[in-house]
């Protein structure tokens, strides 16, 4: 019997004056569930425009039967064209996570730092690579090259090594994974990281709105936009 997947998504603006996240969830003709999320950057107009362009182009590409890699390149081209059309949008960009789930397998592609989590048996695992400078900074901490305080306050900690900005992409994460019954997948913007991983795992079986409220309840100053798409394997 084919696995049955259920998906839902929602978002919150947090403490920001505007929403730069964009997400979409679609069921393709063959029953595959498609989820895509983009977290824009480049100011109020730029970030929101970039994330919309990226998601819309990615969706169109996948719905036309193209691969995840082709969808990503379409998203990148759309952001490039959008930035070229208006001078005030120069430098805009976004992260992107796209995932396809069908039967017992997930395939994904991502650029940037938006996390893609797997939750199984109460444990949270990040599936995709983090293209911010956090992994390098944490590695420096582990090697004793910097202190914990220096790592936490490093000026590049939240900077991205790669993003969908219309330039050639040098860092792209792609993968696939077999999934057991009862597995939950979470496609998120990095605003979710205000919440500890253990609490994300504990709230993964709740409705997305409940998980968003858990993030907001942390009360982090200047809470970023937060978006969560939840994919549950039912059988």
Language-model segments: which ranges?
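PP2C/PPM-type serine/threonine phosphatase catalytic domain
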Residues: 1-235
